[in-house]
A protein has these predicted regions:
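Short cysteine-rich clusters marking metal-coordination/redox-active sites
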Residues: 87, 135-138
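N-terminal secretory signal peptides
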Residues: 1-11, 22-26
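Residues immediately within or flanking Cys/His clusters that coordinate Zn2+
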Residues: 84, 132, 155
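Short, non-ligating residues that shape and space the ligands of small metal-coordination modules
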Residues: 96-97, 144-145, 167
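Cys/His-coordinated zinc-binding microdomains
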Residues: 91, 139, 162
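N-terminal post-signal-peptidase region of extra-cytosolic proteins
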Residues: 63-80
Length: 169
């Protein structure tokens, strides 16, 4: 009697899961060193308890936990007056109304920040890199920057309205 040798098996489910786990681990490690600088590098510093006292729940969620508000939920998306948009966490002037435009996304959008007002880092939270924008004075999360904005920069700073305060001129 001759024995039939089995054909080589396709990669097992277990092997596929191992590869998936390895890739996930690599993505996590890649993201670890790419966030905002440590709080010690910022001009404005508070403890977590102090931030919780200073900010509303929604501001804390956006600014300190890098959350995102619902589109079209902020009245600042439709703000048309001349003035300055400042950080709701520390009052740092971030954007001029001269750089604001209607992106149609439902979030306040700007083609540039005031000089030195914001910093950026790479955010991998949704599986691919995005440019996160944060307050340069303490690192609070503001939103993200995309490459689909108008001239002169071609950038769209898509900002959570709850992270902003508006000061009319």
């Amino acid at each position: 009697m001759t024995r039939n040798k089995a054909a080589p098996a396709a990669p097992s489910r277990r092997a596929a899961l191992r590869w998936l786990g390895a890739l996930t681990s690599l993505a996590t490690l890649a993201a670890c060193g790419s966030g905002r600088a440590e709080a010690a590098n910022y001009r404005v510093r508070f403890t977590d308890a102090e931030w919780r006292k200073r900010l509303s729940k929604s501001q804390y969620y956006i600014l300190r936990q890098a959350g995102t508000e619902r589109a079209r939920s902020s009245p600042l998306d439709k703000e048309k007056r001349a003035g300055i948009f400042a950080c709701a966490g520390c009052g740092n002037a971030l954007y001029s109304s001269k750089a604001k435009f209607d992106s149609g996304t439902g979030w306040p959008s700007f083609w540039a920040a005031l000089p030195g007002a914001v910093g950026t880092s790479t955010d991998y939270k949704i599986g691919f890199p995005r440019t996160e924008v944060h307050c340069a004075d303490y690192g609070g999360h503001l939103g993200h920057i995309f490459n689909d904005g108008p001239k002169p920069t071609g950038k769209r700073h898509c900002i959570n309205g709850v992270a902003l305060l508006f000061r009319a001129s």
